[in-house]
């Protein structure tokens, strides 16, 4: 092998070695940045989605508070000994507009109900005797608390906001707003694709919402129902193949989880690598070209001297010598 070729190989190898190290380090850093950016994007999306749902629940919470302190509602709750005609007149002229009109302005409202000890006869769906509250699915597990309590039933597709009204430490009435499940969680449904999924749970870990577009993600065994798993169990399965983030509601005790397939995140990293490959190949060709050029320059005089010596060995007495 000629000296020039050896020198070319030496120059190319010594140039490629640091370039390879630099390329690997750069790719590693970019991969880390991409993964971090993906996680930040997920958190940002989840925060915006949570704010969208919170803004809805805040509206209905404000409506519930308004109705709770409405003088007309207070009058209906306090007046217990009135004749049926007067009661019917108050119900139709006062209570019905208060409890029915908001439904025409908010398409997520299914109904607004007042359960009161003063109501003796049920009036349509708006005014109901207090003892009939126990027949409602959401009455189970209610706390003795004047703050708004949120209940979700995924099977019925219903979300309710309940407020207890007390008089002298005795339950006097209950106001309840029933909301459409799909409309309340629509902001979360809108961000879901075939690469991610979302979960909403309460502070006890009960799953209130669970949807995923990942077909290969199996969250339940064949003998398990969707409602039988807690949020922690679901997350332990999700963590095996996905990256997830969480945020808490500011309006109630809901916790929002948003997860994305690790393959989808790795796909972003692979796209960066594919973008880097042409640059790496171009750098390789440049190094090869420079190696050939420099080795030719460095060995030109040596090759001329070798040629002259070869001529002398063959009996030539004419030698060309040039000096720089």
Per-range role (PLM):
Residues 1-36, 40:
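Extreme N-terminal signal-anchor transmembrane helix of membrane signaling/transducer proteins, especially
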Residues 257, 262-317, 321-322:
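Cytoplasm-proximal transmembrane signaling helix
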Residues 164, 171-181, 240-276:
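Short, hydrophobic beta-strand elements of compact beta-sandwich sensory domains
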Residues 91-102, 174-215:
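Solvent-exposed, extracytoplasmic
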């Amino acid at each position: 092998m000629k000296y020039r070729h050896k020198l070319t190989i030496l120059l190319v190898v010594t140039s490629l070695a640091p370039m390879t190290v630099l390329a690997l380090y750069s790719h590693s850093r970019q991969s880390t940045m991409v993964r971090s950016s993906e996680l930040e994007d997920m958190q940002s999306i989840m925060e915006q989605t949570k704010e969208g749902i919170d803004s809805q629940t805040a509206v209905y919470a404000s409506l519930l508070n308004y109705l709770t302190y409405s003088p007309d509602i207070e009058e209906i709750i306090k007046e217990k000994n009135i004749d049926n005609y007067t009661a019917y007149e108050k119900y139709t002229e006062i209570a019905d507009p208060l409890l029915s009109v908001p439904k025409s302005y908010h398409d997520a409202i299914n109904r607004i109900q007042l359960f009161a000890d003063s109501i003796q006869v049920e009036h349509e769906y708006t005014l109901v005797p207090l003892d009939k509250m126990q027949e409602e699915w959401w009455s189970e597990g209610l706390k003795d608390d004047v703050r708004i309590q949120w209940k979700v039933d995924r099977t019925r597709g219903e979300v309710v906001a309940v407020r207890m009204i007390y008089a002298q430490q005795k339950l006097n009435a209950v106001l309840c707003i029933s909301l459409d499940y799909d409309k309340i969680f629509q902001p979360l449904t809108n961000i879901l694709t075939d690469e991610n999924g979302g979960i909403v749970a309460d502070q006890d870990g009960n799953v209130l919402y669970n949807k995923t577009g990942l077909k290969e993600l199996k969250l339940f065994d064949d003998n398990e129902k969707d409602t039988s798993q807690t949020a922690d169990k679901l997350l332990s399965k999700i963590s095996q193949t996905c990256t997830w983030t969480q945020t808490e509601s500011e309006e109630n005790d809901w916790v929002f989880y948003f997860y994305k397939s690790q393959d989808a995140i790795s796909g972003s990293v692979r796209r960066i690598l594919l973008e880097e490959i042409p640059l790496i190949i171009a750098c390789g060709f440049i190094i090869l070209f420079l190696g050939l050029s420099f080795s030719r320059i460095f060995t030109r005089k040596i090759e001329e001297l070798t040629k002259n010596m070869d001529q002398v060995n063959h009996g030539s007495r004419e030698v060309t010598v040039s000096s720089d």
